[in-house]
């Protein structure tokens, strides 16, 4: 059996990157000025046969940082009331500190080197997480500073769809539009979608890579 056929560990699959699925809900589009209101994260794992699956889930409602913009259109879109005491919101520091702690443990346990964000239209989520981490003065950010796995692009390639709901449905997954734009629900769906795309590529024979033929 070739060495490539043995590549069933998470650290082998993504060049040492530890994929973590993230979704955020915000009060606008500007990561520097608009509030981060909700964040969810799901770590991933591989079984002994190399199939990817969701692992640990974390979810936080987040207090707007001091001076944050709250765009009415964004709040109407996601249905979040930042002043609702029942949200149980925590500071950006508390939410990201806990996520980063769990992610660092996962990196170590899996033998990976660094985390990489998986998200749908990932630049948006990545920019808000990075901005919040900077505001919170969190120096040990385990995520790559710019590289991401964008499921909008991956789903466009694998499924011919770039909208999360349509990509999930095309992949044979349930998608409840009434729960959409909840960071927790969108993260769960994105995690399952990413695993399906990665596992589908494996089922089609794309991974492990075939060994180079000896001359």
Swiss-Prot record:
Mg(2+) 2 binds at residues 23, 25, 181, 186. One of its GO terms (molecular function) is nucleic acid binding. Its EC number is 3.1.13.-. Homodimer. The record marks 29, 77, 124, 146 as: Important for substrate binding and specificity. GO terms for biological process: DNA replication proofreading; tRNA processing. It comes from Shigella boydii serotype 4 (strain Sb227). Binds two Mg(2+) per subunit. The active form of the enzyme binds two Mg(2+) ions in its active site. The first Mg(2+) forms only one salt bridge with the protein. Signal peptide: none annotated. The active site is at residue 181. SUPFAM superfamilies: Ribonuclease H-like. This is Ribonuclease T. Belongs to the RNase T family. HAMAP family: RNase_T. Pfam families: RNase_T. Mg(2+) 1 binds at residue 23. Trims short 3' overhangs of a variety of RNA species, leaving a one or two nucleotide 3' overhang. Responsible for the end-turnover of tRNA: specifically removes the terminal AMP residue from uncharged tRNA (tRNA-C-C-A). Also appears to be involved in tRNA biosynthesis. Residues 20-194 form the Exonuclease domain. Keywords: Exonuclease, Hydrolase, Magnesium, Metal-binding, Nuclease, tRNA processing. One of its GO terms (cellular component) is cytosol. Coiled coil: none annotated.
């Amino acid at each position: 059996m070739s060495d490539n056929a043995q590549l069933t560990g998470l650290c082998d699959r993504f060049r040492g990157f530890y994929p973590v699925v993230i979704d955020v809900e915000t009060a606008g589009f500007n990561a520097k000025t608009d509030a981060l209101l909700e964040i969810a994260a799901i770590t991933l794992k591989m079984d002994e046969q190399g199939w990817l699956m969701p692992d640990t889930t974390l979810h936080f409602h987040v207090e707007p940082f001091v001076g944050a913009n709250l765009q009415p259109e964004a709040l109407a879109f996601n249905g979040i009331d930042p002043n609702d005491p029942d949200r149980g919101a925590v500071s950006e520091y508390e939410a990201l500190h806990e996520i980063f702690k769990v992610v660092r443990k996962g990196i170590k346990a899996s033998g990976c080197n660094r985390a990489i964000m998986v998200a749908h239209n990932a630049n948006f989520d990545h920019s808000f997480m990075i901005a919040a981490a900077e505001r919170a003065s969190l120096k040990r950010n385990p995520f790559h500073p710019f590289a991401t796995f964008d499921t909008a692009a991956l789903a466009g390639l694998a499924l011919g769809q770039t909208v999360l709901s349509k990509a999930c449905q095309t992949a044979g997954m349930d998608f409840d539009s009434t729960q959409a734009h909840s960071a927790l629900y969108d993260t769960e769906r994105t995690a399952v979608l990413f695993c399906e795309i990665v596992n589908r590529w494996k089922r089609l024979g794309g991974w492990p890579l075939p060994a180079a033929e000896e001359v």
